[in-house]
Structure formats: C-alpha cells, structure tokens
Amino acid sequence: MSLSPHVENASIPKGSTPIPKNRNVSSIGKGEFLGSSSSNNSSFRMNHYSNSGQPSVLDSIRRPNLTPTFSYSNGVYMPESHRTSSFNDSYLPYDKNPYAKTTGSMSNKSNMKIKTKKNAINTNTRKSSGLIYTTKVDKELSSIDKVNDPNINGLVCAGKTHLGLYKFSPSDRSIKCVHDFITPNSNTSTRGTTSLLPKLSKRTRQNKFSTIADVKTGFNNYKNCIAVCNNSTAISIYDLNKSSSIDNPLITSLCEHTRSINSFDFNMVESNLIISGGQDSCVKIWDLRSNKSKSSNRSDISINTASDSIRDVKWMPGYNFASKNDQGSSTYGNLKSGYKFASIHDSGYLLKFDLRQPAQYEKKLNAHTGPGLCLNWHPNQEYIATGGRDGKCCLWFVGDNANAAENTVLNYGNSPSLHAPNTSLNNSGSLAFPKLTINTGYPVTKLKFKPAYSSNIYNSLLGISSMGDEAEVRIYSLARKYIPKHVLLSETPSLGLVWWDENLIFNIDKGTRINGWDINKEPTVLENLSKNTTTWRDLDGNGLLSVDQEIGSYEVVEPELQPTSSTTCKKHPGTIKNPKNGNPENQGIIGGIKKGFSHTGLTSFTPERPPTLKAGPTFSTKSLTLASGASSFNSSSASLTSLTPQTENREEIAIEPPCIITLDIPQIFNNIRLTKIAHSRKKNVISESSSMKNSPVEKFKYLARQLKFSYIREHNVSDSADTAYKNDIENIDVVKNATETHGDNTTTTNNNDDGDDDDDDDDDDDKIIESHLLKKYNFPENNTWATLMNEKVNNKKSKRNSSSSREFDEKDVRSSISSISASRQSHDRSRKIDKNVEAELQEKIQTLVDLISIATHNASVYLSIDDLTNFKIWILIRDSLLWDLKWMTSSQISSDNASNMDANESSDFEAGENLKTGKEFPEEDGAGTSGAESLVEERPQAFRANSDEPSDAEKKPVSKLKEQLKNTEIIPYAQPNEDSDEVLIKLKELQNQRLESRTKMGETVSDDVIIEEDEHEHQEEEQPHDSPTKSAQFHASPIAKSIPILQKREHRKSFIDTFMLHSPNGYNGDTDIGNEDDNISLRFTYNSVSPRSKVSSLQSYATTTSQLETFKKLSSHTAPIIGSPRHAPSRPDSIGREQLSSSLTKKLAKCKKIIADPPWDTKKLIKQLYNQATETGNVVLTVNILFLFQTIYQITEIDIAKDAIAHFLLLLHRYELFGIAADVLKYCPFEDIMGSEGDQSSIRLFCERCGELITNESSKEKLRAEAQQTGNKKIMDKFGYWYCDSCKKKNTSCVLCERPLKKLTMVILPCGHEGHFQCIQEWFLDENEQECPGGCPGVAFI
C-alpha cells in the first residue's frame, strides 16, 4: 500500500492497529473519507503543531465524489490516480516534525484524506505540493479580493452575513480572520485557533448582503477602502483601518441603481473613481471625494448602455511593471488605463467605453451565444477575456487598429510564424472573431489574468472558475488552449479566485474554505498525464490511438528586451497629484470633465474624437442635464490638465521597435495558400491512396463519397453535369459570336435567299457544337467518333459549296414542286408531331450528356486510386454513350435540315401561282408523291443544262411541262389490290410525258452533280429502311436513260440489291415472280459492278434497260411494302404476291435489327458489365450501374435492383456514411427501397396518468362482440388509444377544442400543450396568433 511521504514517516502510537497490506480498501471509493467516529483499520487522524506550542488545526477536508473515475473535462484525459489531491501536508516544513495519532472518538480535530488505492499512484507522477494555505470559516462566503497594501498580507472575503478581513502568514502558512465588519466586537479567526465568538442576543440584527454580492478593494490613496453590495441596489464602502468596536467602519453608501447591482470596480489609476453596473443596464461612475455623506443617491456619471442587464464591468488596469537593466530600472504602464472600461451583458455583447466620451461605445462585440458572465482585462495589453454560459472563454482584441499588437500564432512551443493559418495582419477581424477560444464545457463565472507583464499575449496565464460541479480552478496558458497548465483541486465547487501576485492564487469554495496555492510548486497537467496510454479508436475496433511522446510546452518564444541608456524612471501616466490649492473635486478625471462643460456651447472636448450623434448609450451628470436629442461634451483646452497623461521625462519603452516592411500581403498570402493547397493535396492523395490499397473499408468509404450514383436532380438544384452542360452551351455561344464577328469583318456575303442563310447558320452551329465536344472529351484525330464527325462536317461543306455554285431558275423549282401543294395541311400536322419528337429527343440528349459527365467523373475517381480495371470500364461506358450521343445529334440535325427544306419549299410555293390541288394525301403517307415527281423534287439539277442562265429555247419546254403538271391529277399511293394496274398505267403515262419534255431539252449532268449524288447515296446507306421505295422508283424510271455517262465504269451492286433484294438464285426480267418460292426474293444481277465504284446510283440505273413489264411486276409485288396491307382483301390469285411480300418484310426486319442493334450496342455492353460486376462481387460498380442505367436499359428485374440498393444502404449505415445514404434515398429512381423495414415502425404508447402500456385489448374485444351482435360496424370507431383501460381515464385532450386526440397530434414545444393538427393550424396560421391557446406566457409560434 502506497502512502504519502509524511504519512509513511509519521509515528503511529501503540494501541492503534495499522492497515493490513492485504486489505482491499478500494471499496472505500475515490473521494470518500477515511475518518470515522471510532477507531478502525482505515481511519487516521493527523494533527500538526506549530513552533509556538499551540496546535495549528488543519480542518477536515472532505471532498465529495463529484467527478467520475476518468475525467474528460475539456478533452483532457485524467485518471483519478493522476489527479492527485492538492490537499496534503507536503507543504509543511520537515523541521516541524509533524506526527499522527489516532483517537477512539470523533473530536473537533480534522481528519486527513489519504490515498489508499493499491498501486494507484504512478511512480513517475508528480504529486501536488502547491497548496500552502487552507482554512475553513463559519460564515458563508461568496466573493474574495486582495488588499492592495503591500504592507499587509490581507484578503477580504464577503458573504450574506459576513465581511471579514483575513491575514495569511508566510512563516507558519496560516490564515486568520482579523476583523468582521458586520458582527461588532468580533475577533473572528478560524475554528479552533481563537476563542469562540461571544453569544449574541437573539434580537441582534444581522446585516445581510445580497446573494449576488461582490467585494472589491481600492488602490493607492484609497487602498483602505472596501466596497461591497450591502443590498441589491446599494454599494457600501468600509474603512479597513476602523476595526475597533467604537468606530463605525462604514464610510458611505452609493445607491442610485433601480435594480440589483451585479458588479463594481475601483479605478487603478484614478483611485477615487468606482464604477458599477447592474440589472438596470446602467453604468454608474462615482467619485468618492464628492460623496462624503453617509448616503449618496446621485452618481457623477450615468451611462445607459441601451442593452441588456450588465453582468460584469471592469476598468482597464494600470499596473506599474518594472524592467531592470544594467544602469537601473524603469517602470511603464498603459497610457489609457484611467479612461477605458468595459462591460458584458446578458445578451452576450461586450461593450468598450472611453470615459472622455461616454455617450457612445467604442467597440461592440458579440462575444457569446448566451449570456456573458464575466470579463477581465489583460494586465498590460488591450485584450479582454470573457466567459459566458455557453462554456467558452474568449480572448478579444479591443485596442485601436493602428496601435494593434501583432498577432502571434499558437505553435505550442515553437516560434511564431507569419505564414501560419491563424495569423491575421488586419486587426479589424477582431471585431467579429475572437483571437482565442477555450472550450471549458461548463459556464465560466470568474476569470482573472495573472498580474504579470507579458510582451506576447499567448504567454499569459488565465485562471478560470466555473459554476458547475467541477471542484477545481483551472489555469490555462493561452499558448496551449486544449490542455490546462494547472488544475487546482478543491473540496467543493469554486466560487471565486484572486491572484495575490505572480505565483500565489487564492480561491473560496462552497464549503466555506479559503485555499491558497503556489503555482510554482504545482505540477502541470502534462507531467501527470500518462505517456503510454493506448485505446481503441472507435467501437468497431478499427484502429488504435496513443499519446504523442513530444510533450511540448506552455510558452511561446518572446523577443529579447533591448536595454536603454537612460536611468530616469518613467512615471505612470495616472500618477495622482496632491493638490495644495483649490478644491480637490476639481482635480482628476471627473474634475476635468466637469470643467469641460463650458458656458458657451456644447462641443466635444477631445480633439481626435469629433462629436457623433449616435443612438445608443445616454449620458448624464450631476451638474448638467443634456438635451434628449444629442448627448455630447464640451471643454476647453485649459481644463484638460488633469486628463492629459503626465509624461515628464518620458522615454521610450525598453523594447526594440518593430521594423516596418512594405509587402504585397494579398499576393504573398495567395502564393502561400496555393503552395500549401498543392502540397496538402499531394500528401493527402498519396496517403489516401496508400491507405486505401491496404484497407478495403477505406476504399469503399472513399468511393462512396466521391462517385456519382444518380443523374436525377431536383428542379431547383443543378448538379455538376447540368452545370457543365450549361457551360458548354455558353462556350458554344461565345465561340459562335466570335466566329460571326470574324466572318463579318473579313468577308462580304451577298445573301439572296433567306432560307439558305438559315441552313448555313444551322450548319455552323452544328460544326461548333461538334468541335467543342471533340475538344472537351480530348478525342484524338484518329479516333473513330472524331473521324465520323469530321467526315460529316466535310460532307456538309461540299454540299453547301455545290449548292451555292449552281443557280437555277426559280420557276423550274416552283414547277417541279407544284404537285405537292395538296400536302400543306398534312405538313402542318407532321410539324406538330415533329416538335414533340424533337422535345423528347432533346431530353434524351440531355440525359446522355449527364451520363457522359458522370462516367467521366467516375473514371477519374478510379484513376486517382490506381484502379485501372474500373477506370477502363467507365471509359468504355463513356465511349459507348458518346456513340449514342453522336447518332442522336446527327439524326436531330438531319431532321432539322429536312424541316428547314420543307419551310423553304412551302415559302417558294406560296410565292408562285396557286395551283388547284386534287385529293389530299392520307396523313400516314406524309408528303409522298409519285415516283417521277419525287425524282424531280429530290434531284432538280438532273433536269437542267450546265449553263448558269437557261436560254429561251430551254424555258419553253419547261413552260409546257408546267401546263402539263397543272392538268395532271395527283396519284395517291397504290393499295395491294386490283387498283394497282391502273396506278401503274397512270405512272407510265406521266413518265413518258416527262421523258419527251426532257429529251427535247438535251440536258447533261456535270461532275458536281454526280459527286453530290454519290454523297446522297452515302446518306441513304445510313438509313436503309427508306431505300426500298426510292429504289423501286429509280429502277422503274425511264428518265435515267437521258443522263449521259461521263466515264465507262463497271456496274456495281446498289445498296438495295445487296441488302434488300438479295436472292441466291439470281433474277431475270422474264422470270415469273409469282411462281417463286417464299424463301426466294428478288435480285438484280449486275455481275460486273465493283462494290467500291464511286458512281452514283442514278448512273448505275441509267445503263440498265428497264422494261415496262419488269417495272409493272416489281410495282405490283412491292406495293404491300409501300402501302398499308392491313385493309387489303385476300384473293386467291394474290397468294404468291403475299408470300413474296412476307419474305421481303422478314428480310427487311432482319436488316433493320442488325443495323439498329449492333454488337457494340450500349445496352448489351452495360448488361455484360453488370453481369461481370455481380460475378466478381464489385458492389460499388453494381449499384452504380443500377442507379444510372436501370430505368433506361432495364438491366435486370426491378425487385433485384431494389434489393441490391437496400443492401448497399445497409452497408452505408454500417460504415456511418449517413449523409450519403440519405442522398441515395433522395435521388433513388425507385420507391419502397427499404421495404417493410423502412415504412413500418412500432410505437408504444404509455398512459400519462398511470404509466401503464396502452393496449386496450379488453375494450377492443368488447366493442368487437357488440359489433357482431348488432351488425353495426361503426361501433369499432369508438376504439382507439386515446384512453387507458387500466385507469379508465382519457389522455390529454386538445388544448383548443378539448376533444380527445385520436389522429394526427401537434405539440407546442415551449409549453408542451397538445392539439389536433387542424386546430393548431387554424389557431396559428389562419388566425395569426402567436401565444399558446392555453394562455401560456411567451411567444409560442413565430
């Protein structure tokens, strides 16, 4: 068993039984006391005697078990074994030879607490040895202050019925009560050291102070004055020198406050001034020289702060710190000490005032979120420490910005660094943010700076006392705010503290005990902390935590002081002069202010502070009543003699002045920030990647945080993909505008046709969009998609150049398209349909753009952690989506061009003659015409000469063609019935007429036309499903005979011959088509045609002799494909035709499927990737694919997708990724993900009166039986959980309608009243009420 040194050396008298070593005394508990009424194995009694022979009684120190075994206060882990009690006798000198003895009964002697836990004290732990003074008094204590007389080691303690002067002796380390100013004829001392108080009569009236009493002592000439709250609205001033029973120690009473006083303070420079603040939010300043009467009801200066009640008010201190050097010493202090004061309020505001202009505050800081409780000035710098109910202690800079001290960075023992993140060269930031914040975890009621000079604010010590259950005083070094430097343990919670000097600190506690510590003898918290502590990081056991072995320090390196050559002592600016002549009231600050009120006018007497008419604090004096509109001052320069600091023989402070260097601070900070950001990112990436490689859990967490799982967004929220898409559009518009501007400045255009300009603008827009997409996704020139896009742009250029190079007569165009005038209404209908299709297409394109952006982001995330497999997967998905985007954008562009062409043709048609139209085409046929008319419409350049201006001879046949077209009846599409022969006859006549008219013209085809036709052929190959009709028309048209061949080339297979009319048996024009088998289809045999021949399809047909019988048979059998076979009658002679039609339809469907569903289809690809992810167990990739592509491509069944997402949510919850899980549920495309687990919850209701569980099974069975007997099912509506079967009483009713609460219930939080949702809604929303319907005070709803 380990005991303290004094206990081990103490002699134990005979007859007392020592504690056995094997005795388990841990059951006594920490903080329990070993003293008892009888002698036993675990009780000791220790008495210490002084040299005088009189026993110096050390009262029993009983500390309740206020703290648990392990204390986590303020983040500091302190085992109970290391929190060694400060109450021990180690401070006693060894030559006193203390001894211990035990007694059999309880007496007035004190019992000493001894640590008895076996092996509890670490041998390396330094015990507390700083407690040198301690005593217990009989009176209740509430406040403590020191006597500012260096000749008296005195303290002043006050309570409800006690105001005592205590003196402590450093020689015998004792504290004695010298005088009690409340109880007459009392020489009170500690219990057992002096005689007891004489018994007072029961009728003796005891003066009681208020519970918020405060006590302060004066300075300099008023160092014998003690100020204390005699009652809630008065301050009583006592004289320390009048301690006899004859003299009345009361000097005066100051009572002007209308409500209770919370705080007051003496001025350290002008010691005749005292300031007070209270619940009435007023600050009163009193001059003791003018208040010589026993009671004063008028203060010299009254300031209404226009804020909440004042909790604490303090003057700026004026310490005279000495600096010794080789040639002497000099003293210096703050030049503003006599004028500045500050107050803290219930609202949390900190106000700083200047006595020279009290009408307005200098600074107003929002110091705390709750009420501010205390404040204290720094001894020599313009800093204020504040404490509040929010558990924070904040340090604020309240000086002028021009004279602000440089902020020092907290490096915990290292030298200050200019580039540290806490450094701020602009002190204006102090107005909004504190320089330092210490989170104590409990309300801070008292705090005091150590009264020592410190050039660096962070080397200051701050003592803090709390209102909570922590029976201790914490001393913090501002250089290390998380771990206190000293923890001074007391018996009960501390009530106040005061620094006697730099090393000695006193406090009082709720146990009416006065304690004094020498902090130089106290161990630091770091010395008592265990260095080998290891614990688990979290409950799951993922990692360990240990303590860093580098202890650090509590100080910041200060600059060295440079000695000065002067030996003259610098006087303090607030030195008091004893006037020889004149009224003493006219001396000092108050006298100067009173003299400042001149008789001529009211102006501000301070030259550097112009008058400011500002709403806020108001000011009043005894000698002058100011107007309500403006509170200002006036004075003359002659009256400021006492206010001006006395600076005779003043010299510079013995500190080297700082060097001023001009720097571009924003640029320096920006460079530092960028460097640190890049370095930190690099380190973070390296550390994260290395840790994630070794930990699958960390990799999962990283991917869950970084990957994008959904492209679904809210309407008011735009994600990164939407923002990127908008930025792309904006960039495209900028590039387009720049291109147009450049084109206008460099070239001149002659636009004759508005429709052509529109087409050119559309082509330019498409070109810009495609080039921007190529640059955005970094496609090389040899990429497949880039090659296709560039080829498409080149084709559009050649088409635009060829169309711009040829010019033909507008009358020819009007004549060639006059046959489609009857389709105008069908065009309008089709345009409406096209708009809807275009809107759907735009939505699909937007979805693809979002998916491409997400795929790119996810690929970059996998690349950052060197997961190349998944990186390639997302790149593959992105490329596949880009293929789909390319196809959709090309189809949209082609549809836009077609619509523009229709618009141009319709406008040209309206400009011409209004021809009579025949029957309207069916809506399903669109703008279809006969074969010859389609050929003329699609290729008008094939029916004119090469010359730019047609001759008169050429115009005449065209006019005849125009007349013929007027008389020509528009032929509808043929149906697969007996009318097909008539359609073919009419088609033959029309073709012959066109052939004769064109033969006379003798037109030829140029090279450009053939090249353009070849380009059109490439476009037809991209859309093979539109080719059968056109192929039949071209093959049957005899117009091709008039087109000459420029070069002799071999025949080739056309697109139609290869894919649609392929037959293994070949085709002969004389063959009977109706006798062929179903599996044999039509085939044209051109054995000498090369498939790579760059000859137009029109030229290929021009070298072939197309007989009328062949065309007739082909038309009759291809009619079911062109027409609508749904309503065709079935005839016996058309069986062969129907079989051939069925065979062609199957082949056509097969070709469409092959082209529309290639092997690299996105749906196939994503399904394969999904199957691979499920087989390999890649959870993140599986869920990501389901989120993004399930609703688009139907990857798997809905139930499987929901189940996978639900398990993914459970994983997120397991690894505490609750925010990501919430986003997954928010943007999930499916509903009911969690199933029954997420929708259903069991809630148990208990009766408010009896506390039993409400089941109401008996009433339920009773009502069910009654409903079965009567057959009335409405009886079950009476059942509910708004009553209790156990106590037969109803629960709380609605506060408004007083009916039972059966359905949705609302609770008013401030008062707890309940009500129906509709009742509460009507009361607060409809009737705009703010109070509770039950009449509860306060605002219940805002």
Swiss-Prot record:
Extent of Basic and acidic residues compositional bias: 952-962, 1016-1028
SMART domains per record: WD40
Key word Glycoprotein present: no
InterPro entries hit by this protein: WD40/YVTN_repeat-like_dom_sf, WD40_repeat_CS, WD40_repeat_dom_sf, WD40_rpt, WDR24, WDR59_RTC1-like_RING_Znf, Znf_RING, Znf_RING/FYVE/PHD
Modified residues annotated as Phosphoserine in this record: 1037, 1081, 1088, 1090, 1124, 1134
UniProt keyword annotations, A-Z: Metal-binding, Phosphoprotein, Repeat, Vacuole, WD repeat, Zinc, Zinc-finger
Biased segments, Low complexity type: 630-644, 815-824
Any single Gene Ontology cellular-component annotation: cytosol
Full protein name: Restriction of telomere capping protein 1
Native source organism of the sequence: Saccharomyces cerevisiae (strain Lalvin EC1118 / Prise de mousse) (Baker's yeast)
Single GO MF descriptor: zinc ion binding
Isomerase is among the record's keywords: no
Function, as annotated: May be involved in a process influencing telomere capping.
Composition skew (Acidic residues), residue ranges: 753-766
